[in-house]
Amino acid sequence: VQIALADGDGLGDSWAQVLKCLSEFQRLHMIGTGAKTSSVFFPASSEAPSPMPQASAKGAAPSKAVASSTRHAHSVIIQPTRPRQSTAGGGSREHAVAAVDLAAVDELNSATMLDKVDVVAIDRIFSQTEVLSPEAIVHFVRNLCAVSREELASPTDPQVYALQKLVEIAYYNMSRVRFVWARIWEVIGDFFTEVGQHANLNIANYAVDSLRQLSKKFLERGELQNFVFQREFLKPFVDLMGVATSLEMKELIITCLDNLVLTSARSIRSGWRPMFEVFSIAATDPAASVAEPGFHVRLTLTLTLTLT
């Protein structure tokens, strides 16, 4: 943590190891505090997920440090006991025992983590990315996307810690010089397009809604004449609408853009183009719940922009 805070500009692709550690710290922190894991909010089944907290925006209060006056002598156990394979009849019992062993190790590690790791310092790693050099922030974002990809790969226990941090990073760095921001968003935007196609629809929906929140914040900044940053920012919506097979996903994309039109129309410039592309795709969809709102919004926008 201290190396990341002091020498972030020089870490390069070594950010991968740092961010993997932070992801593991977060997992142990949730175990130690009894918090619900991501799998509760993003079940792989068709069951409705529990209400998920909104991704943190810039200016949100950081996590509180976990204070403790007691210091333990033991250190984190890096290699936990692994389940053993067996062909004997008692195999299932051995697996159950091994699972208990792993749970005990996690409990011990989480207690050590709560006692030794400064959670506020971890938050500063992300909030201070706005002062990283142009090259360093791109390295940071690429490696955070890679860690998020690993977290989301589990079919039974996906984690969204790194994905939530990507949303925060986008907020923190949105005020950078535009050509630097364009490099950052090229990486983040492509990753949101990827996660928006996740097999777990709950995760895919979360990614699209996070994209909506970021888009609203970005559009509020306005756009100078002859620039097309809004068009690039909203491009993931077009890409996702073109490949979406889920009716729910298509409806969500339409709803997100409709919301952006209602809240940010005065600030939109080059962003109109990807919006029209999405609504045009929707207008030809065989599902009425997608085609009708897509057609009506497109028609309304055409008439409004023609008359103004």
Language-model features: where?
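HEAT-repeat alpha-solenoid elements in large eukaryotic scaffold proteins
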Residues: V1-Q2, T112-D123, F140-V147, P155-N173, ...
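Alpha-helical repeat/alpha-solenoid scaffolds of the HEAT/ARM/MIF4G superfamily
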Residues: A4-E151, L166, R298-L301, L305-L307
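Alpha-solenoid helical repeat scaffolds
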Residues: A6-D7, Y172, R176, K217-L224, ...
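Short, solvent-exposed secondary-structure capping/transition elements
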Residues: D9-L11, S175, A204
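HEAT/HEAT-like alpha-solenoid repeats
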Residues: G10-H29, F140-S148, F179-V195, K217-M241, ...
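Structured catalytic modules that directly regulate molecular switches in eukaryotic signaling
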Residues: E151-P155, Q197
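Eukaryote-biased feature marking scaffold/signaling PDZ-domain proteins and nuclear chromatin regulators
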Residues: H198, E248-M249, S270, D285
